[in-house]
């Protein structure tokens, strides 16, 4: 092999190794920013055909309805515990902070946080549904899959 060809080969190999390393570093950095969405039934029964369940310590978002009678507030702190439910699953959520004004029992919410065990999420953020006609697309799709005969919500914006 002549020296010129050998130098080109070394250069190409170094570029490929550099690109591979850069890709690996980007994927590693983005790994911590991925929050998967689950419904309570997907957390209990598994998601998809493989029935994959989230693992403790995993960051995730879970959406469902606040179970009536399940909201427990600590009178001395901002700590709140409540249960989320859907068609076939119930999970508990604990949150330390100020809840949105629209948060109430029977209301749809999305809690973002870390899974402590199979059915308990420690939420870092709680989002409440902001309009009775609006349902987040992820929740609407999940509810349509669980209840295909029922109309869940309408994402369209209607003039007042």
Curated annotation (Swiss-Prot):
Record has Protein biosynthesis as a keyword: no
Location within or outside the cell: Cell inner membrane
Main location: membrane
Periplasmic side: 30-160
GO molecular function: heme binding; metal ion binding
Residues bound to heme: 130, 134
One CC-aspect GO term: plasma membrane
Any one GO BP annotation for this protein: cytochrome complex assembly
Basic and acidic residues bias spans: 133-148
Membrane-topology annotation of the record: Single-pass type II membrane protein
Annotated TM spans: 9-29
Superkingdom per UniProt: Bacteria
Record flagged with keyword Metal-binding: yes
Cytoplasmic-side positions: 1-8
Pfam families linked to this entry: CcmE
NCBIfam families per record: PRK13165.1, PRK13254.1-1, PRK13254.1-3, PRK13254.1-5
Protein name per its UniProtKB record: Cytochrome c-type biogenesis protein CcmE
Gene name in the database record: ccmE
């Amino acid at each position: 092999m002549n020296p010129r060809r050998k130098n080109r080969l070394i250069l190409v190999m170094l570029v490929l190794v550099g690109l591979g390393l850069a890709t690996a570093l980007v994927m590693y950095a983005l790994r911590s920013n991925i929050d998967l969405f689950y419904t309570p039934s997907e957390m209990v029964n598994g998601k998809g055909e493989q029935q994959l369940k989230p693992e403790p310590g995993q960051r995730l978002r879970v959406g469902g309805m606040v179970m009536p009678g399940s909201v427990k507030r600590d009178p001395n702190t901002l700590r709140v515990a409540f249960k989320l439910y859907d068609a076939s699953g119930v999970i508990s959520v604990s949150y330390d902070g100020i809840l949105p004004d629209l948060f109430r029992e029977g209301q749809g919410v999305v809690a973002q946080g870390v899974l402590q065990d199979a059915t308990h999420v420690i939420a870092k953020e709680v989002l409440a549904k902001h309009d009775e006609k609006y349902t987040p697309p992820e929740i609407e799709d999940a509810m349509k899959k669980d209840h295909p005969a029922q109309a869940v919500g309408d994402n369209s914006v209607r003039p007042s």
